[in-house]
């Protein structure tokens, strides 16, 4: 057995093997076609969205990686500052890339799965098919907005706040008006907390002024605007008022909001009332359950709705706050020293450090520049804007995940690689136009790779039988490896897969089962584990179970059948 480096991501090795094995007269024209198609994609310098389509074995991933290297060379000055994000389908794929292209790690490239894109959210939990579909749907935008609004509280009864011995009534009407003013701003929750508090404090200051400044003769209030402003200051500095604002409009953390939402069936029912019980149940998880891959996009959406949240590295944030506090201490010392040192008017005209810089500015001047690489800084910052984004197996991204990715690339300079015939996620892509339309309209270009140089024609013939059942009009790449290349065997259901898997030195074999069955047998992989990977020998177990395992079951089976480069064994009946 080999390490991850032996797992074959569809790459140049397959092309070279095919070229060495090919003996037909059309080889020259086919290689020319491959080179022409790939070169156009790799060297396309347009600064927009490019979709690269192609069936199994057409080298989509290899082209995407070559394009990454090309862009990093041509646009080095821009991309060395902004970084490049490469999203892959699984950790094995990303580890392979980091091994075969180690130089990418030195040029500001961040490798990630979409489920790991939000800092601090580590997807370990297993998500049900219905859960993935629901969490991936764009309807979650409305559900999450409702979840945030739950924290913007209006009390059922008036609350009496005692400030300097005076009882002030915080009525539901006043809170409702403050909430409406904050919401009208259209800004995120945490960022309008100050506006909410200001409206509330202003109302209480006016109420206080009415109590103590009323003219006994019925004239105008005896307090001046300055007096009312002082009352306002007394209200906002009152501990009770600060605590009340915390209750009515708390500072939120998107991860906490999502965890509290998903672990409370009652809250789910209130914010997702349009869903039936089964669908609502798919959102529920027990308190303390681990994050799943679908959760990252939801946390990211909440971060957008909540605002005032820079990322996850609280340690870095705490360090910065300490730096600012230390800098303020230095300025305070300088200020007090200066006031005692000034002997005459001319000295007072001398500019000192505290006259031209505040604490935050001084702290920033002392900060060690570029102490982390571009990739490290980008990886930990949810507001980072990447110069370019490359997405492999992009057909798997849900509507919510596309929203998250698009936020990472405001310029929309992206290379999107995928094949909708292989979409395994129930929330994945059916149409590039429908998926990309909300973000870029029709402003994207599409390239198609037409030559399958990895999968032997014999093996593709089996896969194409399945493809015809769900996408009969889908284009199929011309198989370069024809003739006697490739072995296909069919075995009865119940056959021991390990007994029929070839065991030859230097060849990598795998047994593929339905995702729901992979925990039953040690050593096997589920369909979702083999996305983007190639193997010499493949055994596919129980095709009908794979089909029944997911709403995208036919696509999953198509993926499983097209992972082999030398031999394919099918245990059990094929559909149709």
Residue ranges and their predicted role:
Residues 64-77:
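Walker A/P-loop NTP-binding motif
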Residues 77-82, 91-135, 339-388, 393-576:
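Conserved helicase motor core of SF1/SF2 NTP-dependent helicases
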Residues 60-61:
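Conserved lysine of the Walker
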Residues 171-388, 397-402:
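Conserved helicase NTPase catalytic core signature
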Residues 46-50:
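Pre-Walker A (Motif I) flank of P-loop NTPase domains
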Residues 52-54:
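Hydrophobic anchor at the beta1->P-loop junction of P-loop NTPases
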Residues 32-44, 377:
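Pre-Walker A adenine-sensing motif
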Residues 1-17, 277-287:
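N-terminal accessory nucleic-acid engagement/regulatory domains that precede
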